[in-house]
């Protein structure tokens, strides 16, 4: 049986990449593959600081070198330097096929000459945003393929959902439940990338018109002072609102909660394929999101923050969209592995 190594943030980390990679890992295990996972983050969150993470990442080639030979090394790693480091160390991988998955919008990333160099070393490139593979520069289009990140869990239940969150979602009292999740990303490029302020403003407007509840989830710890100030501002605005539950840095999966939600709101300023949107649709939950990238069939989209509350109301009042089956892309990844190994 083929040996596979997945290099990625993994659960209990928070976010779509860790969720998708974790499901890929466990599905491969259940299907009899000899698969290992290298978590690029620490299970103990207090160690997830730049110096410690850099040191952990530095050890990856040594981990590969001192383990029995892998046939495929599949990397789900963010950033320029991480991809470059993995590629430069390819000679120690004992002939393993190297696969990179690009999560998010690939266009800004591949404008970087170091990323292009790193990707040229890969045997296959997976783009989660449909259409990105055809837009890869030069000969990278020959290596690239579109495979969205959506992989369904084999079992969907609330086993790992904290009781306080489950109680908030279940005890509706006739009110409508909105779910939002995002990271506190504020930098020179993005002011509130995930749209916390847009979500709170829309919810405040909706509260004057009807009975709503909001489960607001913060993914991870803010990475700079601006992010910390954003969360301080947001928590100050919702501090006395009993209709809002703010959850900070708790590792659990969203998928089971979509069974209780009326609308999942994703007001991001940029995006990839968005695992959570496909999960919500698969659980027959309505989705409201920005129109900045190609979205799956069945979502409600808006153009500007001023439209968000109105589009949420429209989604509430609309008939559920025709059921759109969400393809589980796990099988596509297995087929890619098989083709890679057949060409070895």
Predicted regions and their residues:
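Glycosyltransferase donor-sugar binding loop
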Residues: 40-42, 181, 213-230
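Short alpha-helical donor nucleotide-sugar binding micro-motif in glycosyltransferases
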Residues: 119, 251, 256-261
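Donor nucleotide-sugar binding/catalytic pocket of nucleotide-sugar-dependent glycosyltransferases
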Residues: 120-165, 180-182
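A charged, aromatic-enriched C-terminal amphipathic alpha-helix characteristic of glycosyltransferases
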Residues: 160, 303-306, 316-344
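Conserved donor-binding/catalytic core segment of Leloir-type glycosyltransferases
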Residues: 168-194, 200-203
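Nucleotide-activated donor-binding/catalytic signature segment of Leloir-type glycosyltransferases, i.e.
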Residues: 218-220, 228-249
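Aromatic "clamp/platform" in nucleotide-sugar-dependent glycosyltransferases that forms part
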Residues: 269
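Short hydrophobic beta-strand element within catalytic cores of glycosyltransferases
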Residues: 277, 281, 286-289
């Amino acid at each position: 049986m083929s040996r596979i190594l997945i290099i990625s943030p993994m659960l209990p980390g928070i976010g779509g990449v860790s969720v998708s990679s974790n499901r890929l890992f466990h599905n491969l295990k259940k299907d009899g593959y000899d698969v290992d996972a290298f978590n690029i983050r620490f299970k103990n969150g207090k160690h997830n600081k730049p110096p410690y993470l850099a040191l952990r990442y530095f050890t990856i080639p040594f981990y590969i070198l001192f383990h029995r030979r892998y046939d495929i090394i599949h990397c789900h790693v963010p950033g320029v330097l991480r991809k470059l480091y993995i590629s430069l160390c390819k000679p120690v991988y004992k002939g393993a096929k190297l696969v990179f998955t690009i999560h998010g919008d690939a266009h800004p990333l591949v404008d970087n000459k170091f990323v292009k160099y790193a990707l040229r070393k890969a045997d296959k490139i997976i783009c989660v945003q449909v259409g990105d593979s055809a837009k890869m520069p030069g000969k990278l289009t020959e290596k690239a393929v579109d495979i969205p990140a959506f992989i369904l869990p084999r079992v969907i239940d609330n086993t790992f959902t904290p009781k306080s969150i489950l109680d908030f979602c279940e005890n509706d009292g006739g009110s409508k439940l909105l779910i939002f999740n995002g990271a506190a990303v504020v930098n020179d490029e993005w002011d509130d990338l995930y749209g916390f302020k847009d979500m709170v403003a829309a919810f405040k407007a909706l509260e004057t018109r009807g009975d709503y509840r909001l489960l607001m989830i913060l993914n991870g710890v803010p990475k700079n002072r601006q992010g910390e100030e954003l969360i301080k501002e947001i928590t100050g605005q919702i501090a006395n609102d009993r209709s809002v539950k703010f959850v900070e840095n708790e590792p659990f999966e969203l998928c089971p909660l979509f069974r209780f939600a009326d609308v999942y709101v994703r007001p991001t300023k940029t995006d990839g394929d968005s695992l959570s949107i496909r999960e919500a649709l698969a659980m027959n939950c309505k989705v409201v999101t920005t129109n900045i990238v190609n979205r799956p069939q069945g979502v409600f989209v808006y153009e500007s923050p001023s439209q968000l509350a109105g589009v949420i109301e429209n989604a509430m009042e609309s008939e559920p969209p025709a059921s759109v089956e969400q393809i589980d892309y796990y099988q596509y990844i297995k087929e890619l592995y098989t083709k890679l190994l057949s060409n070895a």
